[in-house]
Swiss-Prot record:
Membrane protein topology class: Multi-pass membrane protein
Recorded family membership: Belongs to the chloride channel (TC 2.A.49) family.
UniProt entry keywords in alphabetical sequence: Cell membrane, Chloride, Chloride channel, Ion channel, Ion transport, Membrane, Transmembrane, Transmembrane helix, Transport
Domain of life, per lineage: Archaea
Name the UniProt record assigns to this protein: Uncharacterized protein MJ0305
Organism: Methanocaldococcus jannaschii (strain ATCC 43067 / DSM 2661 / JAL-1 / JCM 10045 / NBRC 100440)
Upper taxonomic lineage: Archaea, Methanobacteriati, Methanobacteriota, Methanomada group, Methanococci
Major location category of this protein: membrane
Length: 395
């Protein structure tokens, strides 16, 4: 009996310890998202085509001196985990500041990557400071904290963080710290900014059995586009990596190309959240949607692929939304379910995280969209399995 009490007390202490650690990590993730939101909100020259190359060049100067600031934040964390490199929080914070300026000026990148690197770097510092044992779980918790603050969807982002690292070895026991970190990250962002949802729109959809086959066809269609997007990004990224020139010149070239695209198609600028929201409530011609799709894929590839600090998940969701509405236009039905289908398909395809993709989209858009989200996530994962947008993802 006394031994049982001791064991139970030990479990309570362990749970309390992890709640405390995860909460601290979540606070950093939420604050990172707040910082980027403030930079974007108060940047003096938002979406200025002429400033894009200049800001990209300045960001590249930092990358030349601090390599960890390069490109995708999630990829940087994955590389550090795979190679046992140390992550430092001050560099993660610097990436948040640079990415905020890049997005504000019009770079096609997401805020989730820098937020993830910031919170995961802080988590890694805690891992070393407190001499914790399971570094992988600590890093997963860091990823979840950053995603929770960025997406305002704590459950889906916690699952997404676990799947990105563990894949088929996903263990539900490891969900506890990531969920805590993700919830705290979301709460911090909400309490400071007042923004409760990623998309402040009300959507409704009545499930129809006749849509089932169309959802399957649409998921295959969006998977094909996601595959092309992954190939395009990887090719452009490797091309920039192979250039034997300073990163500031690489990012300058990327900035010039993004500026040219943005001049003709200004809708591709930024994270893509505003554009995704507009797809739900506005009508666009099929020709313009195709141009928008190509422009967003290229703008994202030239932004993050050139080494400019930023994230890939938000632009991927936007590309998925465009893919979904293009399919809807082709069949004569541009309703919201096909946009959600496209987002779930592309999100799952680019991250190889079907469960996280399905839950995240259902959490963001509502339970009415669980069917297209689930179908899209499963098919997107199967169609592009072992091919992701992240270079250092581990299988």
């Amino acid at each position: 009996m006394p031994m049982n009490i001791v064991n139970m007390f030990g479990k309570y202490i362990k749970i309390i310890k992890w709640i405390g650690i995860a909460s601290l990590i979540g606070i950093v993730g939420g604050l990172s998202s707040v910082i980027i939101a403030i930079i974007i909100e108060y940047f003096p020259e938002k979406h200025n085509v002429l400033l894009i190359p200049i800001v990209f060049f300045i960001a590249g100067l930092f990358v030349d001196y601090i390599y960890e600031l390069k490109g995708s934040g999630i990829d940087r964390v994955l590389k550090a985990l795979n190679t046992n490199e140390k992550l430092t929080w001050i560099r993660g914070l610097l990436k948040v500041l640079l990415a905020g300026a890049v997005i504000a000026v019009g770079g096609s990148a997401g805020k989730e990557g820098p937020c993830v690197q910031s919170s995961a770097s802080f988590a890694d510092e805690l891992y070393r400071l407190l001499k914790l044992k399971n570094r992988e779980l600590v890093i997963i918790t860091g990823i979840a904290g950053g995603l929770g603050g960025a997406f305002s969807a704590p459950l889906g982002t916690a699952i997404l963080a676990c799947e990105i690292i563990e894949h088929e070895n996903f263990n539900y026991i490891n969900l506890i710290p990531p969920i805590i970190a993700s919830v705290v990250g979301y709460l911090i962002f909400y309490l400071i900014t007042g923004r409760k949802h990623l998309f402040n729109i009300t959507l409704s959809y009545t499930i129809n059995i006749h849509d089932f086959l169309l959802f399957i066809l649409g998921a295959f269609f969006c998977s094909l586009i996601a595959h092309c997007y992954i190939k395009t990004y990887r090719k452009i990224s490797s091309t920039f990596d192979n250039l034997k020139i300073p990163y500031c010149i690489k990012t300058l070239i990327g900035g010039i190309l993004v500026a040219v695209i943005s001049y003709f198609i200004p809708e591709v600028m930024g994270m893509g959240l505003t554009l995704t929201k507009e797809l739900f409530i506005m009508e666009f011609s099929l020709v313009f949607l195709v141009l928008l799709l190509i422009g967003k894929i290229l703008a994202t590839s030239f932004t993050v692929g050139s080494g400019t600090p930023g994230g890939l998940v938000f632009p991927s969701m936007c590309i998925g939304a465009i893919s979904g509405i293009i399919f809807g236009s082709l069949i004569g039905d541009c309703s919201a379910p096909y946009i959600v289908l496209g987002i779930a398909t592309t999100l799952s395809a680019t991250t190889n995280a079907p469960l996280g993709g399905a839950v995240l989209c259902t959490e963001i858009f509502g339970f009415d969209f669980a069917v297209p989200a689930s179908i899209g996530a499963v098919i997107g994962y199967q169609m592009t399995k072992l091919e992701t947008i992240f270079k250092y993802i581990r299988f």
